[in-house]
Regions:
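Vicinal oxygen chelate
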Residues: 1-5, 83, 87-126
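N-terminal beta-strand motif that seeds the catalytic metal site of vicinal oxygen chelate
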Residues: 1-21, 70-74, 122-126
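Residue-level marker for the onset of beta-strands and adjacent loop->beta junctions
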Residues: 10, 40-42, 70, 82, ...
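Amphipathic alpha-helical segments
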Residues: 20-34
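Short secondary-structure junctions
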Residues: 31-37, 93-97
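Conserved short beta-strand elements that form part of the metal-binding/catalytic scaffold
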Residues: 33-67, 115-121
Length: 126
């Protein structure tokens, strides 16, 4: 196997049809720190831990808006408590908090339908 030239993941991007609404959701509702805001480029970035989350208004950039099926798992200390707080802010979850045997998860979407997950791993990595 060849040595990987991939050094890491620089950012994860989600598409929006309304940049200001997405900024309110990721910044105000989820409490992520906004690090970049370029309204003239229809673009914003948020920071959490070692991840940069980019939010782009794809259609205004000449790209197709698409919602992907892969969840972005957001690490929290207590999934149930974080879910309760977000529900109080109007976020709707799909199903109950579930236990996989190694972690707790709760699924929801952003206002554009991008799938997100509250996640807490309690079992050690093998």
């Amino acid at each position: 196997m060849a040595e990987s030239m991939i050094e890491g993941v620089d950012f994860v991007a989600v598409s929006t049809t309304d940049l200001e609404r997405a900024i309110e959701f990721y910044g105000d509702t989820l409490g992520l720190e906004r690090s970049v805001y370029l309204p003239e480029r229809n673009y914003a970035e948020f920071e959490t831990g070692n991840l940069t989350l980019s939010v782009i208004d794809a259609e205004k950039m000449g790209l197709a808006h698409s919602v992907r099926g892969q969840h972005i798992a957001l690490h929290v200390a207590d999934v149930q408590a974080a879910r309760k707080q977000l529900e109080e802010d109007g976020v709707q979850f799909q199903g109950d908090v579930f236990d996989t045997g190694v972690c707790h998860m709760a699924l929801f979407t952003d206002p554009d339908g991008n799938p997100l997950m509250l996640h807490h791993r309690y079992a050690p990595r093998s």
